[in-house]
């Protein structure tokens, strides 16, 4: 099961207390103040780790507490600082304050880290309070309390390509063909209840990460069907594969289906509709009137959408689709490079 949300409690370590002590050495019966400071409490730090794919660990353990600083000692000995508690999260984790909703960090790079709760400072020992008017202070500070709060972790899929379409359009079958992913596949809506990641291997060191976004329906932007839970997974994809059912047994007109899904994307976020889309007409093996494909290709080509008709059952035109995915990826990479060059020269 793909867990992409978690709410956890974090409590940094308290600072150690300062010490009240006096120097007691042979031949120095009335030595001065020698109470050491308390150690600092440990921080709680989140760090992005490329080996993790889910937030599953945070489902079973929700409370985290860092070590407190040790108390100061006599002889001006400072207490030992508490150890930081480091929590590893997947790359792409967004960290929010659960109470205010404020975004604390967006961990998008390997090794990127953020302190979510700071340890308390250690209290000063009585040696720090010595003054010309008070040569033997009997006071020391208590350590500060470590920060504590509830935070929310949200993982957005770091996929290059999002596969979208109505339930049963064939998205799970497509990702299983293009990659080694093995999602649950059956002939009823909402078979895929969680996003599935797959990798399309183009060459030894060349691959494209795909995300099978669970079936969307009309009203998804208002939370109907699987709604917001999965619309937000599309946000970080670079482009989309929009699958439509063209079989004789289809439930709706392919163009209507395409436009309904796009309206839901636009309602959720106007930026989503701007993402490039490859339109894939699936189930041509179950289509008797092939002239429909010519009409569809004309319709989508006129609107600037690359179009390919496939059969995921017979694997017809799968190679064409893979080439189209590669071409779209390469074109976007080139545009990104050109844009960065222009910005660099500005």
Swiss-Prot record:
Q: Which family does it belong to?
A: Belongs to the TRAFAC class OBG-HflX-like GTPase superfamily. OBG GTPase family.
Sequence ranges assigned to domain OBG-type G in this UniProt record: 159-330
Q: Give the gene symbol.
A: obg
Name its species.
Sulfurihydrogenibium sp. (strain YO3AOP1)
Q: Name one GO biological process term.
A: ribosome biogenesis
Q: Where in the cell is it found?
A: Cytoplasm
Q: Which InterPro entries does its entry note?
A: G_OBG, GTP-bd, GTP-bd_Obg/CgtA, GTP1-OBG_CS, GTP1_OBG_dom, GTP1_OBG_dom_sf, OBG_GTPase, P-loop_NTPase
Q: What is this protein called?
A: GTPase Obg
Instruction: Describe the subunit structure.
Output: Monomer.
Q: Which Gene3D superfamilies match?
A: GTP1/OBG domain (2.70.210.12), P-loop containing nucleotide triphosphate hydrolases (3.40.50.300)
Under Pfam families, the record lists: GTP1_OBG, MMR_HSR1
HAMAP family to which the protein is assigned, alphabetical? GTPase_Obg (MF_01454)
**Binding-site list for Mg(2+):** 172, 192
Q: Which UniProt keywords apply?
A: Cytoplasm, GTP-binding, Hydrolase, Magnesium, Metal-binding, Nucleotide-binding
Enumerate the PROSITE patterns for this protein. G_OBG (PS51710), GTP1_OBG (PS00905), OBG (PS51883)
């Amino acid at each position: 099961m793909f867990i992409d949300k978690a709410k956890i409690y974090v409590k940094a370590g308290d600072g150690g207390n300062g010490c009240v002590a006096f120097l007691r050495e042979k031949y120095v019966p009335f030595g001065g103040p020698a109470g050491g400071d308390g150690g600092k409490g440990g921080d709680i730090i989140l760090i992005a780790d490329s080996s993790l794919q889910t937030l599953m660990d945070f489902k079973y353990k929700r409370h985290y507490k860092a070590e407190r600083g040790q108390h100061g000692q006599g002889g001006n000995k400072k207490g030992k600082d508490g150890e930081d508690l480091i929590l590893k999260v997947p790359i792409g984790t967004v960290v929010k304050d659960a109470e205010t909703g404020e975004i604390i960090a967006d961990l998008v790079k390997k090794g990127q880290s953020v302190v979510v709760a700071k340890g308390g400072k250690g209290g000063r020992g009585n040696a720090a309070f010595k003054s010309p008017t008070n040569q033997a202070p009997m006071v020391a500070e208590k350590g500060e309390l470590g920060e504590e709060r509830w935070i929310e972790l949200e993982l957005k899929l770091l996929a290059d390509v999002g596969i979208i379409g109505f339930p049963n359009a064939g998205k799970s079958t497509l990702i299983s063909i293009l990659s080694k992913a093995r999602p649950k596949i059956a002939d009823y809506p909402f078979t895929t209840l969680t996003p599935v990641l797959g990798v399309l291997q183009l060459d030894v060191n060349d691959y494209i990460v795909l995300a099978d976004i669970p079936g969307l329906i009309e009203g998804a932007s208002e939370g109907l069907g699987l709604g917001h839970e999965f619309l937000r997974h599309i946000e970080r994809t670079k482009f989309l594969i929009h699958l439509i059912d063209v079989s004789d047994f289809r439930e709706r007109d392919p163009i209507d289906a395409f436009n309904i899904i796009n309206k839901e994307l636009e309602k959720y976020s106007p930026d989503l509709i701007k993402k490039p889309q490859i339109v894939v007409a699936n189930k041509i093996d179950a289509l008797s009137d092939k002239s429909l494909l010519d009409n569809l290709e004309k319709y989508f080509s006129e609107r600037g959408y690359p179009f390919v008709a496939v059969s995921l059952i017979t694997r017809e035109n799968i190679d064409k689709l893979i080439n189209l995915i590669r071409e779209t990826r390469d074109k976007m990479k080139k545009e990104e490079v050109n844009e960065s060059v222009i910005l660099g020269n500005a």
